[in-house]
Amino acid sequence: MKASVLLSRGAAPSALVEADLDDPRPHEVLVRIEAVGLCHTDLATRKALGDRPAVLGHEGCGVVERLGSGVAGLEVGDRVVLSFAHCGRCVQCRSGHPAYCDLAITLNNSGRRADGTPTIRVDGVPVFGSFFGQSSFATAALVDARSCVPVGDVPPWVAAPLGCGFLTGAGAVLNVLRPGPGDRLLVVGAGAVGSAAVLTALSEGVEVVVAEPVAARRELASRFGALAVPSLDDPLPSVTHALDTTGRPELLNRALSLLQRRGTLAVVGLGPATAEIEVRDLMLRGLQLRGCVEGDAEPAQLVPELIGRCEKGRLPLDELVTTYGLGEFDRAVVEQREGKVLKAVLIPES
């Protein structure tokens, strides 16, 4: 099938080009993309790939157009959110933790299917595709059926970030930290992931403190009901739980210092490979330091839960989103990086 895809080559401007997508295999689905979120992981991967041509994008939402012969539970015409790929067979997948799938790297970051075959060709030449099992910076994407979560009539530009960014922030709160009424959560960094965590915690009746240098993001967090400060160096109350979205070692240590005894810090920001942590303090105060990928979520369960909260007015994720045309990718990157927008979502031109 022909599709328009956003082809990236390192730091060079991205370009919309025509590509050929494979026909769906028995376990695959062809989805017409209606919206796709822009995530920091897309930009980090583009940088890591250097000049290798790639079709990225991993927060897609769209309509099922074709089904592989072995797909059950989906119908042509279903609107679906596309989340990360997982095998569905390993111990982690079977125990409800697909983000830690044994094949996670192969299925999400190899640029091809698990068997090594490509899914996207430009001018007959295979390019890096199957990113997070989808490569949805495009008008259409070929995905594994396990990655598709039906979402009904939710606006696609709101639903798309539920595939990764909003899923990560919300899941970190609901699945990993699990604070409740009477607890106080510190969120370090109020970008898309952090803001989704803020809204989710507030919907649980949790008191929330936010450290965020960008004034517009602080103002938004304050309007939602959080206490927002520019820096962790500001006077802050102690907290029962903390979530770091930055991965910066100095902020990790400051967040740990603000935890009450037996408190928990979850880390979702990917920073340097190493960091110095005061292990004795962790031991003596009974602190926990938790890693967290994709909110440790089962998308098929958490995405509908979050949509339900949105529909009831408990989770106004739509207020975090700014839309752009797919061809405006480079402008969206700049404006999101500069803090002019919180969550950029790209809409493929019809």
Task: Please provide the spans of the model-predicted regions.
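Conserved beta-strand positions in the Rossmann-like core of class I SAM-dependent methyltransferases
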Residues: 65, 209, 266
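Glycine-rich phosphate-binding loop and adjacent beta-alpha segment
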Residues: 249-314, 347-350
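A short acidic, Gly/Pro-enriched loop at the edge of an enzyme's catalytic core
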Residues: 27, 234-242
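Mid-domain Rossmann-like dinucleotide-binding core that forms the NAD(H)/NADP(H) cofactor-binding site
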Residues: 139, 146-148, 152-232
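Cysteine-cluster motifs in flexible loop/terminal segments that predominantly coordinate metals
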Residues: 84-146
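Glycine-rich beta-strand-centered segment in the early N-terminal region that forms part
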Residues: 22-36, 46-94, 99, 152-154
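C-terminal hydrophobic helical "lid"/dimerization subdomain
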Residues: 3, 300-350
